[in-house]
Amino acid sequence: MQMKVILSIMVLFSLVFLLPSDAYANDGSIILETTSLEHDARQGQYNSLVQVDSDTYALAYEGKDKDGFISTFTISSDGSSIVEVDTLEHDDDHGQYNSLVHVVSDTYALAYAGTNDDGFISTFTIDSEGVITPIQIQNHANTDTVDDVANLEHDIVQGQYNSLVQINSNTIALAYAGTNDDGFISTFTI
């Protein structure tokens, strides 16, 4: 009987001191998944996620048929709710190795590997509601609309493993693997 009491006290002691507490949750020692959303049931690779405003997020990824997509989501401040808002297929051929960055105001730039793994940069506006409007994208090269402008093909050999950062309000820098997987850093004015 005495052994059961000791074991019960030890179990209670371990539960009290080992259960996660909000007081310690922000020190990085505990990671708990709050919720999740399967936003693409066919394919969702080469993800790059950025915050648009307090509860709006934009995701560039390779989706179905290896095409390039951007989707926006509203995520509650406590992470308990994720709702998809808008999706745009910006490249109907290829969209790997995405790196999405905020440039200025509601303008965003995306570096990715497109057709033949060439390096491309596209631009979009994303408003605070999550509505995506293309400015310069690869699919514009396939239209007859006068206002549609194709995106920039910055490397005609290879543009993989992109990492894009904002330098100032109209300049971005891109690190990527180019010809023969050599490392390159390039800057661009948007």
What is each residue range found by the language model?
Residues 1-25:
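Sec-dependent, cleavable N-terminal signal peptides
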Residues 26-190:
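Extracellular, repeat-based ectodomains that mediate carbohydrate processing or recognition
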